[in-house]
Amino acid sequence: MPADLDPRTWLSFETRGPGERDWVKLYLIAVAVLIPTAIFQLFTVFLLTLLFTLIANGHGDSGLANVLPWIVVGGYFAWATSALIVPLGAGRYLADGIGARRPTAEEADAYRDATSSLPLDGVKRLPKSLYVLDRHELNAAVVGDAVIINRTVFDSEYMAAVIAHELGHLNSMDVRVSCAANRLASLARLTEPMRTQTTEARRSGQQLGCLWGLVMLIVRGCSGGLQTTMMGPAWASWWRLREYAADDYAAGLGQAEELARFFDENVVLYDVPIRFVWMTTQSHPPTALRIERLRAHLERG
């Protein structure tokens, strides 16, 4: 294998690619640590169902209360896990969420030209949708079945290399695992502003009242915020290895030199030291090591 991997990770290196199969154990751990949250969710939906049916009908519907929690909580976990098969709508959702737009005719032509310049015979998946993000950084991302490319990439000489790297993510489990993990964490991220504001208010000595305290108890118990935070460094370790794998894929498409130059001229200058990186959510490895690995591909021919 060309160049050693960044050793600052506890995940394994396998012959099929850096960390390719590690997502299985990570996802199972992510689900397992959410079991207490799932139990709290079941209990909460059970009590709320009894309360609402009591108010509406004059008596609690125990039959509905015994069934509905399993439908709601089970549906949530099934929805998250379904992304491992088909991350339906993930690309459009993120594109809308960050303000990406449809490409102009000129941008669409540039994308087709860059893609057609790659040897695509062995490529199994291509993005079905293209979005453009009006930002100055030279960057791109693939989410679901969509690729989102920053506008300035279209004016650069590195577009084919950037696309080749993103194809590496698309033609592996990266995109689907990322979507599934994000869905598992969606309740935590959705409620994070509320939880943070409440914590800050309490630290400042504000009296929030018993009712708000009960609401926040339910929110905290159902969101899985602590578990999501615990899993962050583990997922980041996996992603650092997957960035190497996507670089390898781009090298396999003949873009090793171009991608190395892209990193050397546009990315490495912005790297900063990350203390105890295995304890952080830093998802990209040091750029210098990525450049070294890509150039080792060239030396091997």
Feature map (PLM): residue ranges:
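Helix N-terminus capping/helix-initiation residues
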Residues: 82, 86-87, 104, 274, ...
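Exposed alpha-helical structural elements
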Residues: 89, 93, 110, 258, ...
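Membrane-cytosol interface motif
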Residues: 97-117, 241-263
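Active-site-proximal gating segments in proteases and membrane effectors
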Residues: 119-144, 193, 210, 231-240, ...
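A Zn2+-metalloprotease active-site environment signal
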Residues: 2-100, 127-128, 132-252
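Low-complexity, intrinsically disordered extramembrane tails and loops of integral membrane proteins
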Residues: 1-16, 113-116, 256, 260-261, ...
